């Protein structure tokens, strides 16, 4: 019983950089989170927040020449993946942990049929299966994602964008992984197809019992698919909690408020969108204090000088000086952007 309650993935104080002869990019700066078995965690943030770098770190697929994991732990089923050899990682990748990337065309080879590509993934991780068993599995997984098995003899260019993404999802799920990482899986799709793919992912997750890390910038996708949420900004997690915490709690990190402010409201014509002013900080020269301070309308003097501590109660955590009980008692701070 105790093992059932343990997280399938736990990341502790992960730090990742990209290093060249000229500069060091601090991409991920000490993030920690966990994914419970059978649950979906949404990792939300703007482009450049460090979401994809986090995903690539889990699979140890960072660029060999520049990517460096500087510290932390990535524990999958209790085993730190940073301390296993490459041969063991090949058993994990695509078999126990799979990933769906943003652009389906970057994951599909145009000169092979989709059936051959799914079959290659199955044979790599299930060498004991006969050819007939592999073909049967290809048919099953295509049916599972809503594609007629007869189309396994077709090439990627014969599929629409939404169907290509279904093929990629089929490849990711063909070995029934315990964890699926979905990196902006619907970004390249129109709204109607996006809804269909999201509904399919949710159904497959429920049917197969697969845990999932959903990487997105879209809070609407988070609301539809996730159980827990981490909001990421400039390599750090600034807010975390259940999906109810993020959408219903009275208090939020100013960055999370900014994300909500940039979502169109279909219930009224009066409210204008309120985009977050400014740009993500230079990752080679991050601010001394809170990374969001230069863009924050509620910025105080302490925000520019000190990193915020973790605040909040229960499952809802905030990394912001506004909610620091010690600051509220002493009155330290003062708005500097007003």
Kindly label every feature range from the protein language model.
Residues 181, 185, 189, 193-271:
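P-loop NTP-binding/switch modules centered on Walker-like glycine-rich loops
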Residues 81-98, 124, 246-250, 281-287:
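ABC ATPase NBD coupling module
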Residues 154-159, 163:
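Conserved ABC ATPase signature
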Residues 76-80, 132-150, 257-261:
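Conserved ABC ATPase "signature" region
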Residues 174-178:
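A short, proline-enriched helix->beta-strand linker immediately N-terminal to the Walker B motif
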Residues 7, 242-338:
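Short catalytic/signature loops enriched in Gly
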